[in-house]
From Swiss-Prot:
Adapter that links the PapG adhesin to the distal end of the tip fibrillum. PapF is required for the correct presentation of the adhesin at the distal end of the tip fibrillum. Pili are polar filaments radiating from the surface of the bacterium to a length of 0.5-1.5 micrometers and numbering 100-300 per cell, and enable bacteria to colonize the epithelium of specific host organs. Gene3D superfamilies: Fimbrial-type adhesion domain. Strains of E.coli that cause infection of the human urinary tract produce pap-pili which are hair-like appendages consisting of about 1000 helically arranged subunits of the protein PapA. These pili mediate binding to digalactoside-containing glycolipids present on the epithelial cells which line the urinary tract. It is found in: Secreted; Fimbrium. The gene is papF. InterPro entries: Adhesion_dom_fimbrial, Adhesion_dom_fimbrial_sf, Adhesion_dom_sf, Bact_Fimbrial_Adh_Pro, P_pili_tip_PapF. This is Fimbrial adapter PapF. GO terms for cellular component: extracellular region; pilus. The keyword ATP-binding does not apply. Residues 1-18 form the signal peptide.
Length: 167
């Protein structure tokens, strides 16, 4: 009788069935961009330029700007985007004056072009002009004549956006 009661008890007891569920884990490893020039616009003022002196090698203006990067692992990348002047120059911003642009270089001088555009998404590697001890970046802007075209007088301007990030 005890066996029969035990058998009936076992039959009446429901068996719990466990079902496997998947756990989805997501997120984003976010590398924050650097703050450039304390978040203020950078002004490069050439003043008056004599068109006869625009020979792509003089009249440069060098700027040193502060950079603050909360994440400093890997290499520093810079991205400068703006209207590129034609003629095969990948570091020259077009201005509103025909045949006249502004060439950009990393560091002081004209040995390392500051290439414009997205590059690999983060821009291009910084190879000159970085002073990590002072948290600054130096770049040089140079008046540029495309070809032998005549430069008309007048106010000129161009704009670009700059961002920097470690990656």
């Amino acid at each position: 009788m005890i066996r029969l009661s035990l058998f009936i008890s076992l039959l009446l007891t429901s068996v719990a069935v466990l079902a496997d569920v998947q756990i989805n884990i997501r997120g984003n490893v976010y590398i924050p961009p650097c703050t450039i020039n304390n978040g203020q616009n950078i002004v490069v003022d050439f003043g008056n330029i004599n068109p006869e002196h625009v020979d792509n090698s003089r009249g440069e203006v060098t700027k040193t700007i502060s950079i603050s990067c909360p994440y400093k692992s890997g290499s520093l990348w810079i991205k400068v985007t703006g209207n590129t002047m034609g003629g095969g120059q990948n570091n020259v911003l077009a201005t509103n004056i025909t045949h006249f642009g502004i060439a950009l270089y990393q560091g002081k001088g004209m040995s390392t072009p500051l290439i414009l555009g997205n590059g690999s998404g983060n821009g291009y590697g910084v190879t000159a002009g970085l002073d990590t001890a002072r948290s600054t970046f130096t770049f040089t802007s140079v008046p540029f004549r495309n070809g032998s075209g005549i430069l008309n007088g007048g106010d000129f301007q161009t704009t670009a956006s700059m961002s920097m990030i470690y990656n």
